[in-house]
Amino acid sequence: LLWGLGHASAQGVDEPMRRQAAALFRDALSAFRPELAGPMESSYALQGLHAYVRAFPGESGPRERLRTAANRLAARLPAGSDWVWPGDRVTYDSGRLPLALLLAAEAVGDDRYREAALRTLRFLERANFPEAKGPLRLIGNSGWWERGRDPAAHDQQPIDASGLVEAYAAAWRATRDPRWLGRAESATA
């Protein structure tokens, strides 16, 4: 909900729509509890918060909620581990998590979020690009990617490709590292 309303607040087709979306966003934000949200719910909410904060930079409340949600999400990522994911299973739309942290880093200028996002994106590369210069291979939903196992190879979700393209493009914007631009291009092929 916050994702859609945040974007509608910033990019709605006309001013009345943007005002209505902003009012609905503020109402929905009052019910958002980062401490109760799962990692993917927080990732989606952070995308909406980012859009809203960019459209309304003078409002401190949404910016602080963004920071709180990003802190909690980044804290869920294991440090010093090969498995850089907040749980034992990677499922669909996994690129949204590093994307959300990259957007949070952009919104509030906190490099900790950027570094956490890049670690997570490198982790996801192991499943999505198992061959260094090979094509994108999405994690299948017929088993997903469980810790200690190979990623499932069948029943991939198209939503995964869009999230990864956005995450790789955001990583390139944040770092100007051509690696990420190359991954974004490969993921669209």
Task: Please report, for each region that a protein language model flagged, where it lies by residue.
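Glycan-recognition and catalytic cores of secretory/periplasmic carbohydrate-active enzymes
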Residues: L2-A189
